[in-house]
Amino acid sequence: MQGRVMPSDYQRIEQAIHWITQHAHEQPELGDLADYLDLSPYHAQRLFTRWAGVSPKQFLQYLTVDFAKKLLDESQSVLSTSLEAGLSSPGRLHDQMINIEAVTPGEYKLKGKGLEIQYGFHETPFGECLVATTPRGICHLAFVSNTGRQAPLHQLKALWPRAQLNGHQKATAELVSRIFSLGPVHVNHRV
């Protein structure tokens, strides 16, 4: 009698990421993922978080916001974007975008019109970075390459062409220090 071959943790996470990506528009629950992986919800949560660095719910939220941004870029309304992304209301999209992007869906759709964004360049253990913030948290982070500061600054301006961009080293320095410290960081809860 041959026993059942158990997939490795790596294979399970690969399957989980693929499955969540394929079912993101359905907004699946942890129990659905656990059933697919043939694990308890507790073990699915722990395994995914350990290997992916975020919970399955957080990963799903990132996918949802990414999809919503594409729809908003195509001039879809916030309501239709929310529904097409599988969310029950625009309020859920609003909360997810604030949490992940530090902007509302409307601010994103209007490319920052009426929004003030502060930015600064700072040294990190990984090289120099540009960090940009709204009053709600980080809306952009990019590392400076060999080509210099112009590329990340140009990228920021392209992402937020209608925002008021203000270079402000001091305002962003403390946040960058917290991000690259050794403790837990919560960056999108008021800077």
Per-region residue spans from a language model:
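Basic nucleic-acid-binding alpha-helical/helix-turn surface characteristic of O6-alkylguanine DNA
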Residues: 1-85, 91, 95, 101-191
